[in-house]
């Protein structure tokens, strides 16, 4: 973390600004602080202090090393909430996650997906709702797939009924 970084920015601001992390959406502070959303996550009180306070020099020894995992697991929960789905919907409609490389899908927008909900099993993939295939993203991202989970695309389309899933397109 650079010392020239704005002192009012948090670890979250810094983390979301890293190249390759553009698939992630900002999890609001109130969601992060809600103890219900932290259930089952280890060391949440210590890590919560780090990710919400203004960024400090990482050489100070106040970073635990699990911040990325902790934020990723909170993110996976958040994107299943109403507010999280709205944030991901905006990114989907803008094409932030890329498009399907399959020519027959006609550059269909994709969604991020993890092949496992277990941390450390695989990096994030992109899922095409038209051909139902998963692909490696073109962007330079090494995000863990657990930050999205294997069911995110299904949840996304089932919770946003105003979207017609390309799977329902009679032309396919």
UniProtKB/Swiss-Prot annotation:
GO terms for cellular component: cytoplasm; protein kinase CK2 complex. Probably not expressed in wild-type flies. In males lacking the Y chromosome, it is testis-specific and constitutes the main component of star-shaped crystals. Induction: In wild-type flies, it is strongly down-regulated by double-stranded RNA (dsRNA) interference mediated by Su(Ste) transcripts. In males lacking the Y chromosome, the absence of Su(Ste) locus, relieves such down-regulation, explaining why it is strongly expressed. One of its GO terms (molecular function) is protein kinase regulator activity. It holds the Pfam family CK_II_beta. Interacts in vitro with the casein kinase 2 alpha subunit (CkII-alpha). The relevance of such interaction is however unclear in vivo. Unknown. In males lacking the Y chromosome, its strong overexpression leads to the appearance of proteinaceous star-shaped crystals in the primary spermatocytes causing meiotic drive, possibly by interfering with normal casein kinase 2 activity. Belongs to the casein kinase 2 subunit beta family. There are multiple copies of the stellate gene in fruit fly, encoding proteins that are extremely similar, which makes their individual characterization difficult. Thus, most experiments probably do not discriminate between the different members. This is Stellate orphon protein at 12D.
């Amino acid at each position: 973390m650079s010392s020239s970084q704005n002192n009012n920015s948090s670890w979250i601001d810094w983390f979301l600004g890293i190249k390759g992390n553009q698939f992630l959406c900002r999890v609001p502070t109130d969601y992060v602080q809600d103890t219900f959303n932290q259930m089952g996550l280890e060391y949440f009180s210590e890590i919560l202090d780090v990710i919400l306070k203004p960024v400090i020099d990482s050489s100070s020894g106040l970073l635990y090393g699990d911040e990325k995992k902790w934020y990723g697991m909170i993110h996976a929960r958040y994107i299943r909430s109403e507010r999280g789905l709205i944030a991901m919907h905006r990114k989907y409609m803008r094409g932030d996650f890329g498009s399907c490389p399959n020519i027959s899908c006609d550059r269909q927008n994709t969604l991020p997906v993890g092949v496992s909900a277990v941390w450390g099993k695989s990096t994030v993939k992109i899922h095409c709702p038209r051909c139902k295939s998963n692909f490696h993203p073109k962007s330079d991202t090494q995000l863990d797939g657990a930050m999205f989970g294997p069911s995110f695309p299904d949840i996304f389309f089932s919770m946003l009924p105003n979207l017609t899933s390309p799977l329902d397109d009679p032309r396919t």
